Amino acid sequence: LKNVVKSVEPTFFGWFVALISYPPFNSITGSRIPWGANDHVFFWTSTGTTIFHIIIILLLGVYLWATFALGPKASNLTNRGIVTKFPYSIVRHPAYICKNLVWWITLIPVMSWQFALGMGFWSMIYFFRAFTEERHLSQDEEYKKYKKKVKWKFIPKLI
């Protein structure tokens, strides 16, 4: 499998933002910070619902592709090697951006300031996950070359 751990995330903050995203921590946090995203959303009309559901399915498809592309190198807190095939050949964090976009889209029909703040909190967690992962992986020369080739973290030509 060529699944060798090259290095481990060295910072408390890196561990914190990774672990808060998983049970039981995300459930505890989610019970105190409402975020409103859900799997069963209706977008005012059947046409609107269909269009948004197609967008959600496409984003989930890219998310799934990103997950499979990582294969045995998938790890939040260790460097097991750099994955450069699609969709990682387009952006450096395709799973994070797709997951966040799905959450924001499913929030649209029930948007409130409380849910917007909660979703903003979770989006920041994922931004900081990307930040700490990149800081850690940038110790690897192979990742430095990858960053020069794939310039965008989340959305090509934007972020």
Report residues per predicted region.
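Juxtamembrane inter-helical linkers in multi-pass membrane proteins
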Residues: 77-85
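Histidine-centered phosphotransfer motif of kinases
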Residues: 84-85, 89-98
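Membrane-anchoring alpha-helices and their flanking helix-loop junctions
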Residues: 1-77, 105-139, 145-159
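Hydrophobic, membrane-inserted alpha-helices
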Residues: 98-106
